[in-house]
Curated annotation (Swiss-Prot):
One of its GO terms (cellular component) is cytosolic small ribosomal subunit. Keywords: Ribonucleoprotein, Ribosomal protein, RNA-binding, rRNA-binding. This is Small ribosomal subunit protein uS17. GO terms for biological process: translation. It comes from Synechococcus sp. (strain CC9605).
């Protein structure tokens, strides 16, 4: 059986070691043939708390880790520019304090 993978965007990182990833799927409507986009939200395990809101990530299906969490972060494809700027500002603030 193949390992299921999805690519999506982190929309929430407020939980400890867990992020919510939104995956958008597009398909034609069966009757009207208009392209419909549907967003599915997955709770994914983030062991090191490295993901931030806006990051593009690849998630893979794994064993159940809790009642709703059955996916894990495989890799961070790209960091959001906002999160990268915030981390740079934090680093500068720490340098100024020292």
């Amino acid at each position: 059986m193949a390992v299921k993978e999805r690519i999506g965007t982190v929309v929430s990182d407020k939980m400890e070691k867990t992020v919510v990833v939104a995956v958008e799927s597009r398909f034609p409507h069966p009757i009207y043939q208009k392209t419909v986009s549907r967003t599915t939200r997955y709770k994914a395990h983030d062991e090191d708390n490295t993901c931030r809101v806006g990051d593009r990530v690849r998630i893979t299906e794994t064993r159940p880790m809790s009642r709703q969490k059955r996916w894990a972060i495989a890799e961070v494809l790209s960091h959001s520019p906002k999160a990268a700027a915030e981390e740079a500002n934090k680093a500068e603030a720490q340098e100024v304090k020292q």
